[in-house]
Amino acid sequence: MRIVVDTNIVFSAILNSQSLIGQILLYSDKTIKFYSPRFLQTEIQNHISKIKKLTNLNDSEIYELIDLLYDKINFISEELIPKETLSIADELTKGVDFDDVMFIALALHLKCKLWTGDKLLMKSLQQKGFKRFVTTKELKEIQKK
């Protein structure tokens, strides 16, 4: 199963690697393959000072954890996503959050589900007919099998 991972999921795993989200990302087997646009790395880097404030980890521990999480994600260059797909994703995310365009575009391009904790994004996308989501609970069940 292929899953596109949104930044808020990785952010949550960094803040608490022992959480269910952290455990799913860090200890997933070959059943689930995680993908993300390279933009995720930029977003995490942009929030590194916030991460430092919210965790009890020192710099080397934070970067070690980020490296472990990144090792579990297949990063795809945004340049590989067709322009038509980007246009569709742009329309779907209008009025919500421009930063989510690449994640939606990648999910469309790979024909897979999006794992996000952004309820507003999910609601808005569902209203526009996008229903390719997977929940943390569903991923936990898949991992159990």
Predicted regions and their residues:
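Short, well-structured N-terminal submotif of metal-dependent ribonuclease cores
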Residues: 1-36
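Alpha-helix capping/helix-boundary segments
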Residues: 9-10, 40, 103, 120-121
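Short gly/ser/thr-rich secondary-structure transition/capping motifs
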Residues: 16-17, 57-59, 97
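Residue-level signal for well-ordered alpha-helical positions
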Residues: 17, 47, 127-128
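Short amphipathic alpha-helical segments and helix-helix/interface helices
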Residues: 22-25, 63-66, 103-104, 122
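PIN-domain endoribonuclease scaffold, especially VapC-family toxins
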Residues: 28-30, 35-87
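Acidic, PIN/NYN-like endoribonuclease modules and their adjacent C-terminal/linker elements
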Residues: 36-37, 108-109, 113, 117-145
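Active-site neighborhoods of divalent-metal-dependent phosphate/nucleic-acid chemistry enzymes
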Residues: 75-119
